[in-house]
Amino acid sequence: MYALKRSDNARQAYMVELYASELAYRKHLDAAPYKAFDAQAPDMIDRKLKITLVPHFTGDKHIIPDERTINNLVVVEVKPEYQTEFKNIVLPEMAQSLNIEKGVLAMYAATDVDDPHRWYFYEIYASEEDYQLHRQMPHFRDYLKQTAHMSTRKTSIPVKPLFLRNKGGITADIVPGG
């Protein structure tokens, strides 16, 4: 589970939750800690929007955050005619990044269940330096070059981590059929 807030609007926050299955998600909803949170939520949250995503790539290392840890949340609108080609370029790039770059701690890619051309990317880096190093890697530069014409819009949402907790060890999986 990851909790983030917008860097430019402290009143806007995001929760990123990954579950092994629908059953695991239902178990979470039935657990006492969630029920306690849900009971207090109306006093803390004035508006809530849930976006259900279809996972395409999940990969992470065990994260022990510190003051240098950074998060990126990016939304990319992919032109329908490039959906498959975009996916076939970006997912292997993410796997390579996670496997060979020490400072890349987590990478997730998913599409909106209601708009499959809207991609969400959530990334965690050990530091700003590690993120800048990632941006200079040949595989990342190739991804940018190869996909530049495939999107209609890219939105980078400025976020800061509030709470980062994972079990780590999700292998860099390109989700089949996702």
For each predicted feature, which ranges?
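Short, well-ordered beta-strand segments in beta-rich or mixed alpha/beta enzyme
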Residues: 2-29, 67-77, 108-136
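Glycine-rich beta-strand-turn "strand-cap" elements at beta-sheet edges
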Residues: 2-11, 36-70, 106-117, 142-178
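Short loop/beta submotifs within extracellular cysteine-rich repeat domains
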Residues: 22-24, 36, 44, 94-97, ...
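Residue-level signal for well-ordered alpha-helical positions
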Residues: 28-31, 40, 89, 134-137, ...
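Short amphipathic alpha-helical segments
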Residues: 33-37, 80-105, 139-143
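Amphipathic, soluble alpha/beta structural segments
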Residues: 68-96, 128, 173-178
